[in-house]
């Protein structure tokens, strides 16, 4: 009988993280799909707003995503992809719309076609037994993060809030076959990894972000990401319950944004169980 992973063992985001490995044939090609194991306490979402694809999470998710990107730069098996499957996805924290699965692509060894992306999406969530586990090696990431922090000019960081965000020039973000993708060669993946891993270091009002292939992509994190997701779920339910007909998404979203703000306000002032 296959045992469940121990929570403390499955959720530590460190070098040599244990991940699942599956071999799939998609669009006539062999792929090695590396994914998170059940028990990993990390949550993500995606959305597309103002022409930009966003990966959304919290501080913890940024650390994990950074480690996944860094380790991917060292993979050598053609057809390797990293998948963040549906069980780790939330509705987005703004209007509660469903998230796309997230795939990380090392472009020097893997080509993800739209047909392969659609074939993979149709098979999600991947519930069949994994072919095995891998230890995700991230050599040099901690040193690279420490070096970035040592030379980071904190006084210059606030300029991000009045101009286009800085980020990584080499990695590319987009949507392929219904999957949100971040793709790049090894140098681009490592650069993106450090930029993502350090999100939260210079947060402004509980939020931080970094561009990936600006203006096409961005990773954005919130300190209260999970509370925002919860509020967006409630807001979407409340707004839809009060409508006789569902409006166009462009008209519906502002209603949910406004209601979500109200829900978060209610949650903050709600009395505790012993009040």
Label each residue range with its predicted role.
Residues 2-275:
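Positively charged, low-complexity terminal tracts
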């Amino acid at each position: 009988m296959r045992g469940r992973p121990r929570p403390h063992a499955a959720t530590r985001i460190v070098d040599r993280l244990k991940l699942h490995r599956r071999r799939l044939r998609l669009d006539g090609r062999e792929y090695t799909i590396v994914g998170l194991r059940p028990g990993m306490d990390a949550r993500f979402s995606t959305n597309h707003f103002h022409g930009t694809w966003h990966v959304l999470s919290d501080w913890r998710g940024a650390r994990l995503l950074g480690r996944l990107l860094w380790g991917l730069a060292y993979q050598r098996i053609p057809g390797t992809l990293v998948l963040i499957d549906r069980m780790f996805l939330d509705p987005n924290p703004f209007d509660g719309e469903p998230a796309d699965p997230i795939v990380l692509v090392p472009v020097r060894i893997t080509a993800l076609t739209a047909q392969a992306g659609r074939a993979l999406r149709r098979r999600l969530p991947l519930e069949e037994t994994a072919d095995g586990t891998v230890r995700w090696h991230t050599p040099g990431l901690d040193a690279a993060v420490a070096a970035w922090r040592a030379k980071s000019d904190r006084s210059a960081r606030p300029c991000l809030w009045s101009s286009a965000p800085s980020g990584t020039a080499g990695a590319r973000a987009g949507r392929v076959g219904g999957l949100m993708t971040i793709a790049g060669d090894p140098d681009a993946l490592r650069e993106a990894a450090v930029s993502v891993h350090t999100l939260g270091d210079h947060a402004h009002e509980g939020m931080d972000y970094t561009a990936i292939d600006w203006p096409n992509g961005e990773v954005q994190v919130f300190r209260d990401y999970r509370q925002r997701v919860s509020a967006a779920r409630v807001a979407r339910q409340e707004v839809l319950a009060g409508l006789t007909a569902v409006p166009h998404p462009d008209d519906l979203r502002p209603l949910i944004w406004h209601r979500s703000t109200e829900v978060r306000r209610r949650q903050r002032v709600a009395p505790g169980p012993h009040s």
